[in-house]
Amino acid sequence: MKKILIDSGPLIALFDRSDKYHQASTEFIKKNRSELITTLASVTEVLHLLDFNRNAQVDFLSWVDAGAVTVETITTDDFQSIRELIVKYSDLPMDFADACLVFLGEKMNISKVATIDRDFDVYKLKGKRSFTTYVK
């Protein structure tokens, strides 16, 4: 099965009906046939930004627990590479969650990302390959 990275933005929008990207995120999820891949950093970001609605947080966790998205492990062994990405893109700046996704893209050879973050138009994978972005 093909894989696609998913950033926190579409996940937040999916569980927040008032978000301006809710409809686009919902349509993406309905049409998507690829395995969704994210990181614990993105999951944490989603839960933090959904903190205004406990039910949305619980629904999101249930959705993840049901296997709707695969949460890949980032270990301290990966921190050097992640730190290098944060330094490389310090002018944006790149946050830890985005750096983890770019790192996973490189590690797992995934160049597709569901995001509303325009920074993914700037981020490059090894070999200067661009990400193909969805949702935004």
Spell out what each predicted region is.
Residues 7-8, 39, 116:
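A secondary-structure boundary/capping signal
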Residues 1-19:
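Metal-dependent nucleic-acid phosphoesterase active-site entry motif
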Residues 15, 117, 124-127:
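Short, flexible helix/strand-to-coil boundary loops that buttress conserved ligand/catalytic motifs
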Residues 2-4, 23-93, 103, 107-111, ...:
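PIN-domain endoribonuclease scaffold, especially VapC-family toxins
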Residues 8, 98-99:
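Conserved glycosyltransferase catalytic-site signature
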